[in-house]
Amino acid sequence: MTYMINERKREMAHLYIGATILLTVYAQLVFKWQVAMAGTFPVGSMERILFLLRVLFNPWVISSYVTALLASLFWMAALTQFELSYAYPFISLTFVLVLLLSGVFFHEPITRPKILGVLLIVAGVIVGSRG
């Protein structure tokens, strides 16, 4: 019975890691989207301050702050069940998702070197999770 409880906790902790990854990716994509929508960074000091304040208090950007906070809460929950050296490599999967989704949503180039890098990241996560 204890084994089943511990196994259930590990499964939940993996879900916490997944939630951390997805919430982090959401925050990054929304932040990029809204910064791009705000336009180019102004030259003048006062214009820069106003630009940053406008982006800072944008509702979508605020949602990215909230999801980043939620991601950190899920991360804390995951770390109650796993060693940091086991859990942390999974966070690198955010690079994979951000690369793919930035290609889809922002039409950023997905080049061969980027694909190779992503494959190496995934291989590293697989190897790291086995050890």
How would you describe each model-predicted region?
Residues I21, V25, L69, F95-V96, ...:
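Hydrophobic/small/kink-forming positions within alpha-helical transmembrane segments
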Residues A13-A19, L50-L70:
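Loop-to-transmembrane-helix transition segments
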Residues P113-R130:
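Hydrophobic transmembrane alpha-helices of multi-pass small-molecule transport proteins
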Residues Q34, A78, V104-F106:
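Hydrophobic/aromatic residues within transmembrane alpha-helices
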Residues V96-K114:
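C-terminal transmembrane-helix exit sites in multi-pass transporters
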